[in-house]
UniProtKB/Swiss-Prot annotation:
One GO term of the biological process aspect: peptidoglycan biosynthetic process
Keyword Cell division: yes
Source species: Mesorhizobium japonicum (strain LMG 29417 / CECT 9101 / MAFF 303099) (Mesorhizobium loti (strain MAFF 303099))
Cross-referenced InterPro entries: FAD-bd_PCMH, FAD-bd_PCMH-like_sf, FAD-bd_PCMH_sub1, FAD-bd_PCMH_sub2, MurB, MurB_C, MurB_C_sf, Oxid_FAD_bind_N
Protein known as: UDP-N-acetylenolpyruvoylglucosamine reductase
EC identifiers of the protein: 1.3.1.98
Gene field: murB
Domain named FAD-binding PCMH-type: residues: 34-200
Amino acid sequence: MHGQALIDRLGDRLAGLRGRLTPNAEMDKITWFRAGGLAEVFFQPADEEDLAAFLRAVPEEIPLTIVGVGSNLLVRDGGIPGFVIRLSAKGFGEAEIVSPIRIKAGAATPDKRVAALALEAGIGGFHFYHGIPGAIGGALRMNAGANGVETRERVVEVRALDRKGNVQTMSNAEMGYAYRHSAAPVGLIFTSAVFEGFAEDKATIKAAMDAVQNHRETVQPIREKTGGSTFKNPEGTSAWKEIDKAGCRGLMIGGAQMSPMHCNFMINTGTATGYDLEYLGETVRARVLEHSGIRLQWEIKRIGNFRPGHAVQEFLGQLL
């Protein structure tokens, strides 16, 4: 990676930015897997105005990648070309009550913070965020959900910037939500959203949040280096059941393992590379495909380039 060369190449275009530019940033420091390569340049904008100025300054042929807190992210060992953008909590992490049943939250606001704010205000419908270890931007992009509730059930309006730095607002319908998916254009960077719940007794909300936390601690390896659920649930079944039936519980490749505690959670046991993790995931997909004919779909977002000679084929090249 030649991050400083990219910064120098753009020169005066970036001179007025107030955010931080870091060349050759180590992505394994921010992803929950603690694995992966470098970002050519890592940019943390100071606020929405600074982000808009950055987007207007950077030529469109230079790739941009937006990341959140790194909880659902696998970075490949060859690194990420161009700029990687991460919204800071200082500039994009505020959350507030804007009506008796509505919450406005910045894209860098932790999901857990929204759940806690809803509890304080007696707003029901947000308890599921207590069990999602990400931030609002990622929840909006992938329609994050847990315990039978999804983000799309709470979204009223989303604010974003397009590749040219222009503000765009989208309604719930315009987000095009489906299971763990949004049809919003990939180039949009979400900056905030308004959510709506319903009036509910605080004791009831607290009980629901406690149940979410107890469930996580009982069945999920939350103290491991993990990206959360590895694969989406196929229609009519659960990913973990199919993984288990294919004999992949506890399966290990290098330092990567399918958790013995919850076999849809992939973990870094300490020495895993991005290659180990992705190769393990594709091995599981291949074995499930062979065993049941089901093509598991990744829920974890994989970004960046493979290290030369270490590309990983989907299903390890197995096509049935």
